[in-house]
């Protein structure tokens, strides 16, 4: 689950990290009043969406007057912001963040992720702030400095000092950086974060550090024990089908193709998408119904796939291990009867109760195309999507 910038900064402030004075606003009038409370001559106003590239897309502006801030809010609230990280539709803007402008002398980068190789939280810092860190990692990886956090003792001050020295910080700036580093390290563990990023972490003209931006991603598997963060969830930033799928514990990701895929197991789902591509098709989604799929969940999965108007055919690829193929068949039959499927459906069942599942499908009287191998299933669904 992602947080908005203003939400990330709220958490930063709770841990004593320096953030600009700012206010999240739902209306243009609120933005106007917020600008009046900010003492700096210039005000920054930012669209709040779960996507990067806001500045280049016109979603971040600097204004001298309260009226300018209000006009910006009127322009964007209720509209969609399209950036290089969104689809053509963009993300809806329901809030804008109005905050004080900062005198920036230097921009740094500070972030943290869970490193699966070392099984530790790893901090990354760089003097190249304000730019795409992936690009820096690819072109000049020597500019990225790392510190791995021992889970037994947590973040240590000496690690913060080492990073500060490598970033060229001096004097009181080192103390400020260590405080930020320790705060972020503790916050990362306490809130079950998967990713944390401050880009840029700026050095102001006065020589102080300031968290000018904030990006936080929370481990969805830990949301059950993070009620505070659950309240920060913004469903407007998610694909409606993905949000609906999550309610049924289905792993669904919308894509741009025309062949709907329903598979059990993430690895098999990716392999299915690959072989569909190999035979000239384009998957419309990734959908893993999981090992504990029930008839109801399969029916719901089918509904979600068919709610995409781009879907021209559906491929169901099930390997029965924990899940029984006959239950999958019941779900397919129920969904087809309930929804009234107008597109071809290709089904490949293997494993636990596969013969019984195939028998149920054959006796249903529905227009379902059977396949006995993954290659055959891919060939048939691609042909069906093309109307052959």
UniProtKB/Swiss-Prot annotation:
Entry keyword Lipid metabolism: no
PROSITE patterns: ATP_GRASP, SUCCINYL_COA_LIG_3
UniProt keyword Ion transport, yes or no: no
Pathway(s) this gene product operates in, as recorded in its UniProt entry: Carbohydrate metabolism; tricarboxylic acid cycle; succinate from succinyl-CoA (ligase route): step 1/1
Signal peptide limits: none
Binding site for ATP: 46, 53-55, 99, 102, 107
InterPro entries the UniProt entry points to: ATP-grasp, ATP-grasp_succ-CoA_synth-type, ATP_grasp_subdomain_1, Succ-CoA_synthase_bsu_CS, SUCC_ACL_C, Succ_CoA_ligase-like_bsu, Succinyl-CoA_synth-like
Reaction(s) catalysed by this chain's protein: succinate + ATP + CoA = succinyl-CoA + ADP + phosphate; GTP + succinate + CoA = succinyl-CoA + GDP + phosphate
Enzyme class: ligase
Family, per entry: Belongs to the succinate/malate CoA ligase beta subunit family.
E.C. number(s) listed in UniProt: 6.2.1.5
A Gene Ontology BP annotation from the UniProt entry: tricarboxylic acid cycle
Keywords recorded for this protein, A-Z: ATP-binding, Ligase, Magnesium, Metal-binding, Nucleotide-binding, Tricarboxylic acid cycle
SUPFAM superfamilies given in the database record: Glutathione synthetase ATP-binding domain-like, Succinyl-CoA synthetase domains
Cofactor note: Binds 1 Mg(2+) ion per subunit.
Name of the protein described by the UniProt record: Succinate--CoA ligase [ADP-forming] subunit beta
Subunit structure: Heterotetramer of two alpha and two beta subunits.
